[in-house]
Curated annotation (Swiss-Prot):
Positions of region (Disordered): 29-51
Propeptide: 22-69, 85-100
Protein keywords: Amidation, Cleavage on pair of basic residues, Neuropeptide, Secreted, Signal
Main location: secreted
Residue stretches spanning the membrane: none
Source organism (scientific name): Rattus norvegicus
GO molecular function, one term: neuropeptide activity
Leader peptide range in chain numbering: 1-21
Protein's name in the database: Pro-FMRFamide-related neuropeptide FF
Function field: Morphine modulating peptides. Have wide-ranging physiologic effects, including the modulation of morphine-induced analgesia, elevation of arterial blood pressure, and increased somatostatin secretion from the pancreas. Neuropeptide FF and SF potentiate and sensitize ASIC2 and ASIC3 channels.
Sequence positions bearing Phenylalanine amide: 82, 111
């Protein structure tokens, strides 16, 4: 857990310094080279600030990666364990008709503090 927080703190510090570097105009040299290379090469290879992800999108990706794994969605669709027809049809060998009605209405009870 501590290593995750250390990684987040390091990333925040890097993003903070990255924002200061952008304000200082560190992209000037890259833009000059991108303008010189525009001739035979497509513009997708030019290294310009528009193509770089914003700090907000980087933070969103980081937070999504740190989310705890959730329960499998199939867990919500478990078959009913109690109530009428929970165990399928009754055979003659199992219970009498009166007992069958009684046990078909059985439901789990919650014991403890209310």
């Amino acid at each position: 857990m501590d290593s995750k927080w250390a990684a987040v703190l390091l990333l925040l510090l890097l993003l903070r310094n990255w924002g200061h570097a952008e304000e200082a105009g560190s992209w000037g040299e890259d833009q000059v080279f991108a303008e010189e290379d525009k001739g035979p090469h497509p513009s997708q290879y030019a290294h310009t600030p528009d193509r770089i992800q914003t700090p907000g999108s980087l933070m969103r990706v980081l937070l999504q990666a740190m989310e705890r794994p959730r329960r499998n969605p199939a867990f919500l669709f478990q078959p009913q364990r109690f109530g009428r027809n929970a165990w399928g049809p009754w055979s003659k060998e199992q219970l009498s008709p009166q007992a069958r009605e009684f046990w078909s209405l059985a439901a789990p009870q919650r014991f403890g503090k209310k």
